[in-house]
């Protein structure tokens, strides 16, 4: 007797810091006519049976967060088969760190290794087409105020230029360099990763001076960052 063919899709919805989103909802359509939606479990996980050979598009959503999309092409394999797709959602209310953005030393030129992270941002903006964002570049407290402000502005504009060249409308983007004027506030995730920091600590120059040398360097690295902040969610919504 042949085993029953059961294909199962599993995964999680969580925010970019890695914490589950128990209020998440997933919308799912398939080329077999599937058109459904379902909520996730309290731990942000989900599990649903899928049909062998069917192609699916899934949209992960949660109130207060930007949408994320995944695609699945179920195989024709017989027996039990499992797939996993996770949805990582960016906050629509708080600044979001753009991981793995790198510039040439003391310049605004993006390195080639930044492309993957920026292309993910392009995909997110294409999917969330009614969103406008601020691109914010920050420096650490080393270097002069005017120099840091000029450098951070140029870096924010470099990111904006990249996105525009990839097809994102420039009027959806605002580039702002903050220099060293907006030090990073420690998040829960950061406090878990760096035990000498507490959630809510602000990495000011005065705070950093109280730390040992290695800890100071970590804080300077955390302050050197590029983030985006959602400004509007109604861009061309009523046109």
Annotate each language-model stretch with its function.
Residues 1-132, 171, 193-196, 202, ...:
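Periplasmic peptidoglycan-binding/tethering modules of Gram-negative envelope proteins
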Residues 135:
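Conserved phosphate/oxyanion-binding catalytic-loop motifs
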């Amino acid at each position: 007797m042949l085993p029953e063919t059961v294909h199962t899709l599993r995964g999680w919805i969580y925010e970019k810091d890695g914490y589950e989103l128990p209020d998440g909802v997933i919308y799912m359509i398939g080329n077999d006519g599937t058109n459904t939606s379902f909520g996730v479990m309290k731990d942000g996980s989900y599990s649903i049976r899928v049909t062998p050979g069917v192609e699916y598009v899934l949209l992960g959503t949660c109130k207060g967060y930007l949408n994320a999309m995944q695609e699945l092409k179920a195989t024709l394999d017989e027996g039990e088969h499992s797939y996993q797709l996770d949805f990582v959602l960016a906050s629509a209310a708080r600044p979001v760190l753009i991981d793995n953005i790198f510039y040439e030393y003391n310049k605004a030129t993006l390195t080639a290794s930044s492309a993957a992270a920026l292309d993910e941002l392009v995909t997110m903006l294409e999917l969330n087409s009614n969103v406008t964002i601020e691109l914010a570049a920050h420096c650490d407290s080393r270097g002069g105020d005017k120099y840091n402000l000029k450098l951070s502005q140029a870096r924010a504009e470099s990111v904006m230029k990249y996105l525009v060249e990839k097809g994102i409308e420039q009027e959806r983007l605002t580039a702002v360099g903050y220099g060293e004027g907006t030090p990073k506030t420690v998040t829960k995730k950061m406090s878990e990763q760096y035990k000498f920091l507490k959630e809510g600590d602000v990495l000011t120059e005065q705070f950093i001076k109280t730390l040992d040398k290695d800890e100071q360097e970590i804080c300077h690295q955390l302050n050197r960052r590029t983030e985006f902040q959602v400004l509007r969610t109604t861009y061309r919504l009523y046109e």
